[in-house]
Amino acid sequence: MSAIQSPAPKPLQPTYPAASPASTNAYMKPGLIGSPAVSNHTEPNNGNNETAEPQGPNQRIDLGAMIEELTSLLGKESWTKYAQIISLFILGKLSRKELSNELELVFSPSAASLEKSNTNHHHSLVRLHNQLLLGIFANSLRENPLGRNGNESSWGFGNGSNNPNNKLKRINKHNSQIEVYKKIVMSLPLNDRNRLKMITKEAGKRGFIFCSVFQARLNNIPKIPIVTNPESLKRVKSNNLKTPLEWSQDIMNGFNVPLASESHSLPDTDSFYLRMVGIAREHGLVGTVDARCVELISLALDQYLKNIIEFTIDTVRYRRKKYSDYYDLNESGLYKSVSEMAADKRDAKIKQLDDDKNEDECADEAKSINNGNNSSKDDIGDISMSSITKAGEAVNEELHENRTISLTNEDIYDSLSIFPNLVEPSGSYYALTNLGLVNDDELVDMKSNIDDLPDFLNEKPTFTPLDERNVGTRHELNWLIKGILTED
């Protein structure tokens, strides 16, 4: 079976030199760049020989005929889905395998009929798909169609001026500056054109450009307050609140203050004052800064740094206990390492054996009175040596428990990684996980005293008002609350 011909003749009709799949028994899977090459040779129309441009070696391929033929085979709905899949693949949002799977679903014939004609139809779709991808790839390596009169419909999925569904545009004969700008804008991708439209709308309606790059640049530039109201200017002069030139100098003095990372020390009072005055001027505050504000900021900085050091110490202690040894409760109810508890038990056992040995020695001493003096001297020496050894072990243990541990930069880094709310402006978000709060439904105690309400229903009051204000007693209020909180 020969290839499906184009439904309507076009001024520039492309030729497909590749043989049909039926004649060559060749099948190409969608998404594979293995199809025959598409020729860029075009036959000019006899009626427009004068206006047709000569086809050079870098001439772009007219994809309009292939697109129309593929649209007629797929249908409008399938073509829309196919164009979306190809666009996602070209943008890199679909892999080659995903493209093949999606196109298999689009090109698959209906489940009701699986005849030979449907197989040939599928082969024709695969052939046109491969030729279309090769044509798009070939056009991407050739000159831009903008500026020419004949092939403006060869790019995009039928968005050119030669598409019969689109309104024909008038061609201006004179090459004006506006037309040049228009062609440059139209050559940009769709996302960039939409960004230009948004900038134009925001600049015209709101009077300000809400562009992220522009806003970032404005945030980095120091802001100097300017007085535009005459009354405010009089008040500034009368109160001797300086001039815009002096305000700009205050801002520059704030920027010139050395940072703590440069001086390797906490800022002093003068540095705090200059920095606070500069920030106040940038935000339009032209008054004076009280010295007590500087003291408050200094205390806040000290407390902030102390909190970081405190969290770091707790983290180091926790990691040392967690990864060094297992801990358990001792006889006194205090947490102690398992190795130390085993050592204590071993020492106690050794002490018990020593006591038993001493008792046996005392019994032998009673039997031999003559040798008692010598043995007593030896015992005194042994006792004194054992007491000295135990005292030394106690001192070493005390020094081991009270030894000084230095914090390193790695410890600070680990602490800030575990508690990012210490340095990031998201403390309320990260600190919620450390508060231990529970939901309201988890706060209800199902084993409370209110469960004994059915046992005392006979003592329930009648809720009769004592006066016209309908105010009951405290006892009635308690029963009312119990009735509200319990189910009937």
From Swiss-Prot:
Gene Ontology cellular-component terms listed: nucleus; SAGA complex; SLIK (SAGA-like) complex
Q: Which Pfam families match?
A: SAGA-Tad1
GO biological process terms held by the UniProt record:
chromatin organization; regulation of transcription by RNA polymerase II; transcription by RNA polymerase II
Q: Which GO terms describe its molecular function?
A: transcription coactivator activity; transcription coregulator activity
- Whether Nucleus counts among this entry's keywords is yes
Region called Disordered, residue ranges:
1-58, 352-383
Coiled-coil segments: none
Q: Is the keyword Transcription regulation assigned to this protein?
A: yes
Q: Where is this gene product found?
A: Nucleus
Q: What is this protein called?
A: SAGA complex subunit HFI1
Lineage of origin: Eukaryota, Fungi, Dikarya, Ascomycota, Saccharomycotina
